[in-house]
Amino acid sequence: MRAMKSLLSRRTVLGGALAVALGGGSARGRRILVATNEPWATYHVKPLLAEAARHGWRLTQLVPDYAKVTPGDPVPVATPADAPRADLLVVTGAGDWPADCVARFRRTRVAARALAYQVPVEAPRAKEIRPRLRVITASSPAEARAFGAYLGTKRRIEVVGSPQTDDLPQRVPEKDLVLVLTSVTHPDGTGSAAPGTELLLAATERLAAAGKRVLVGLHPRENRRLWEKYEISSVSSLAASARAEAAIGIPGTVFPLIAAVGTPLVGCTDPALSVPDYLRAVCSSTIADAGQAVAAIVSARLPDAATLADAVGPIGGSARRLLTEWD
């Protein structure tokens, strides 16, 4: 715990250095295209916009068409036919859409970046992407191991940290407040779903009945109506976690980031759920029965410093390191 506190205290100094480093910008603004496994879901790219802008770079997410683009979304999007000329194509996975984009942009340099967790099993189309990859990056050592297995490669993967940890919220927990972290109940054209919503709903009911204050951190693609009986956070789950005594939910990409804030986690793990081991490792415990929820939250603790560092990666300067790898 002392080691993690030291890491967290460094983020202020390193964050200041990051602002200075990015302030001067690049000699020439890079033009980056991004293709994700969730073609219309821009929430994984959005945290990179500010850092890219300070660097004088432009990020554009590739979409199959404009039908599912959210009006007012700050992330620039374009179809392959409309896309600007680019210096680099970044793929965040090896699903059909990223693989199709790699094939389409045959003369563009390609990089892979883990922006969302991937199950450590080689993707069917990874072999189409591997030969084109100039560099591969991940947030943490644990994520790098999973991402490498997913891509079917033993190449070096650069661990750069997560830009979201460059400005972690200061934790001020409120008594009896529990953050409930949802996943996606039903798959759609944008992406898949994770099992476990019924378990999480039942666990949330138990917590509310026990006198806990429930604050819901809603996944961007989750059905809001399932959770409207509770308070739904108006800020990101990462920001909301700073208020919570503990968090409970279906393990996902945000779990290590919330642990980095200092908020302990309980995982709701449906037998059908398939996630990398490191997402479970940051949990104080996992439950498969709603009746276990209250006791698990009351006793929730952070993992040891080594586990946390393995899952979170370096804190501070992550955006600078990522853009350096893309330059």
Task: Show where each model-derived region lies.
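Conserved catalytic-core segment of nucleotide-activated headgroup transferases in glycan assembly
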Residues: 41-45, 165-167, 173-226
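N-terminal export signals
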Residues: 2-26
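Donor nucleotide-activated moiety binding/catalytic core segment of transferases
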Residues: 220-261
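Short acidic-hydrophobic, aromatic-tinged amphipathic segments that line or gate anion-handling sites
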Residues: 76-79, 231-236, 282-292
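Short loop/turn segments at strand-loop or loop-helix junctions that form parts
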Residues: 93-94, 113-118, 162, 179-187, ...
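Catalytic binding pocket for nucleotide-activated donors in carbohydrate/polymer assembly enzymes
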Residues: 254-307
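C-terminal alpha-helical cap of glycosyltransferases
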Residues: 311-327
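Active-site and donor-binding regions of nucleotide-sugar-utilizing enzymes
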Residues: 33-166
